[in-house]
Amino acid sequence: MQTPKKFSSFSDQVSWISDEKGIKINDREYAEEMLRQIGYFPLMGGYKHLFRISNTKKYKAGTSFEEIVSLYKFDAELRELFFKYLLQVERQMRSLMSYYFTEMYGAEQKQYLDANNYNHTKRNHATIVKLIATLKRATTTTDYTYINYYRKTYGEIPLWVLANVLTFGNLSKMFRVFPQSLKSKVSKNFEPLNQHQMEQFLSVLTKYRNVCAHGERLFTYRTVDAIADTPLHKKLSLPQSGNQYEKGKQDLFAVVIAFRYLLPGKDFLEFKRKLIKEIDRVNREVEHISEVELLNKMGFPETWKSITKYHLK
């Protein structure tokens, strides 16, 4: 077991980065300020690796501290951009799921707390039990004035109100155990998606939403689960290993594919425009990482911009 690292001042940290890491410091005052604002571990621990020479601990000659900061800021801008549209998808799912559930079962609180109103198979049993417990807790929360108002005024909270306090993860689990008829009604709003593709999209997007919300490193993140194959995977000629696509399944490009199906066309074009702008900016500012390297780390094919050329079916 190694000896724990000792405290070091911001000035000492800058010296360590320069002398021990061999990273160029163009402005010590700027470097100290960035370490003060961000912290050594989130910055260096999270973003230095792309500047290393493969299979060594050495850095590419000429790598500067400013480049590492630029990569960090790029990731922060990515989180903000992706989070905006993840929230948009989340809002629409709240609306559609509560609408179709209430249309089928009615607005009474007891309906969404009834396990019989879900696809109550042996496989889904544990998920449904946990979901109903979550929904019950949400009905008793005092953190939201509108929940308090409905409880005091009407004695219960309809699902279209309660849905606003549920997390993306709650919504994903709820969709997973919806009856097939309800899954179908929701999914038809995103044709040509089928129920399975929709379910996998929600599962993966939940993970990415959490990464964005908690300020974790986004651009290299991968989920354990994967989105289902779509016609876009084939049309984009994404690389395959055997029958499995190597990109656009568990990586950030999987989220882009999901957005292509889930966002209105004009919103996706705006998202794509902003994404191109951020990638172009970091490519100008970061000399020692090529665009191909960066895109590969993100799980993007080099031809990713052509995603809007193809029909979704």
Please name every model-derived segment.
Residues M1-K207, F219-K313:
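Extended intrinsically disordered or low-complexity regions, especially N/C-terminal cytosolic tails and loops
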